[in-house]
A protein has these predicted regions:
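Intrinsic-disorder/low-complexity, polar/charged segments enriched in Ser/Thr/Lys/Arg/Asp/Glu/Gln
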Residues: 41-43, 74-76, 104-106, 116
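Histidine- and aromatic-enriched segments that form or immediately flank copper-ligand environments
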Residues: 54-59, 83-101, 134
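Solvent-exposed coil/turn segments that connect beta secondary-structure elements
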Residues: 49-51, 72-74, 80-84, 93, ...
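Solvent-exposed, conformationally flexible loop/turn segments
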Residues: 69-72, 100-102
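Extracellular/periplasmic metallocenter environments
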Residues: 99-143
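Extracytoplasmic entry segments of secretory-pathway proteins
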Residues: 1-67, 71, 143
Length: 143
């Protein structure tokens, strides 16, 4: 075949490879951000059980159904369940992690705005699942 050029095919292959490299780099960067828990993040133990949440701060303070945190500070949640599978969700901050009996799962977040936010269970956990809610109170820093 005289006069046939492979130039368009090579351009197409190069563009596809460049796009794949770009998507891979973006995905790696996003995963690194999600998995990297900032140093100094306060640990809060989150325990799910039918049909409420309990929260325990590093200083031993315990809260049931509501969680008080400070704006601009990083928090690491250690999430567990006492009975069945639940799913810890703070929709406004895109926090979502399963609470599994016998296992501790971790997720972190740093609240950016003062206010109230819903905490809910996103995994069907029994008859009163619809009522397994809590409230996150993001408050001004006390220091």
């Amino acid at each position: 075949m005289s006069g046939h050029s492979n130039y368009p095919e090579w351009i197409y292959v190069a563009v596809v490879i460049a796009l794949m490299a770009w998507v891979g780099a973006e995905a790696w960067d996003a995963e690194r951000l999600v998995e990297h828990i900032p140093e100094g993040a306060e640990v809060i133990k989150v325990t799910a059980q039918q049909w409420f949440w309990t929260f325990e701060h590093e200083d031993g303070t315990k809260e049931i159904g509501e969680l008080h945190v400070e704006v601009g500070k990083a928090y690491k949640f250690e999430i567990m369940s006492k009975d069945v599978i639940h799913s810890f969700n703070i929709h406004d901050y895109v926090v979502l992690m399963d609470a599994v009996p016998g296992r501790v799962n971790t997720v972190w977040f740093a609240p950016t705005d003062v206010g109230e936010h819903d905490i809910q269970c996103r995994e069907y956990c029994g008859l009163i699942h619809y009522n397994m809610r809590g409230t996150l109170y993001v408050e001004e820093s006390s220091t």
